[in-house]
């Protein structure tokens, strides 16, 4: 099966929880905008043959000199993914958050291989703490739960159909592989072997620097 994938790099978030005067994916990290750390890694992964950056037009200059396509960001995550999907030319697509500076080539290779067995796969890690449901209050079995990360990999036609279904039914998705779930397509879970960090709060940048 052809492992070639397109990467949709989501960069439309405003970073309101971070409190900075610019979106957190563009904050300085190792002397350049944070998002470029993930992009540079992705461009050296053989399975990724095209990258679509979904961002506001005013930030496109940040990606000058990189071989990427652009798509307009939408109101919701799923709208941005659908926008990027219109520029995808491969049968498989990876979706990655621009506020996650680390992409690991070995995990991308495994993720794609696993996704091709079922149609969709996502990186996950174990839940290390106790989780309680709010209403009614009860303790959940953390062994039955996983923390979801990106990238996620979905067959392009499945992602497109799932997003269209969600739009018709007025469903707001919380992650990208949920589009496959809506079509009753099983999603495979790939356990991450590396530290995962999403830049949400200022202290997350300190952690990211420590992981280099």
Curated annotation (Swiss-Prot):
It is an enzyme of class 2 (transferase). One of its GO terms (biological process) is isopentenyl diphosphate biosynthetic process, methylerythritol 4-phosphate pathway. Pfam families: IspD (PF01128). The keyword Coiled coil does not apply. Its EC number is 2.7.7.60. Pathway: Isoprenoid biosynthesis; isopentenyl diphosphate biosynthesis via DXP pathway; isopentenyl diphosphate from 1-deoxy-D-xylulose 5-phosphate: step 2/6. It catalyses: 2-C-methyl-D-erythritol 4-phosphate + CTP + H(+) = 4-CDP-2-C-methyl-D-erythritol + diphosphate. HAMAP family: IspD (MF_00108). PANTHER family: 2-C-METHYL-D-ERYTHRITOL 4-PHOSPHATE CYTIDYLYLTRANSFERASE, CHLOROPLASTIC. This is 2-C-methyl-D-erythritol 4-phosphate cytidylyltransferase. It comes from Chlamydia caviae (strain ATCC VR-813 / DSM 19441 / 03DC25 / GPIC) (Chlamydophila caviae). The gene is ispD.
């Amino acid at each position: 099966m052809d492992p070639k994938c397109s990467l949709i790099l989501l960069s439309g978030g405003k970073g309101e929880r971070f409190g900075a005067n610019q979106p957190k994916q563009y904050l300085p990290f190792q002397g350049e905008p944070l998002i470029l750390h993930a992009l540079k890694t992705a461009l050296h992964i053989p399975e990724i043959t095209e990258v679509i950056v979904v961002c506001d037009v005013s930030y496109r200059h940040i990606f000058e000199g990189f071989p990427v396509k652009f798509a307009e960001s939408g109101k919701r995550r799923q709208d941005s993914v659908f926008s990027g999907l219109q520029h995808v030319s491969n049968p498989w697509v990876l979706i990655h958050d621009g506020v996650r500076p680390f992409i690991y080539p070995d995990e991308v290779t495994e993720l794609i291989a696993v996704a091709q067995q079922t149609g969709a796969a996502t990186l996950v890690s174990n839940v290390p703490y106790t989780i309680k449901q709010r209403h009614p209050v009860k303790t959940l079995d953390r062994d039955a739960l996983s923390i979801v990360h990106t990238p996620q990999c979905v067959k392009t036609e499945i992602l497109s159909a799932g997003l269209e279904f969600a739009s018709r039914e007025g469903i707001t998705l919380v992650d990208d592989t949920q589009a496959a779930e809506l079509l009753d397509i099983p999603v495979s879970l790939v356990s991450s072997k590396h530290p995962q960090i999403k830049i949400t709060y200022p202290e997350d940048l300190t952690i990211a620097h420590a992981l280099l």
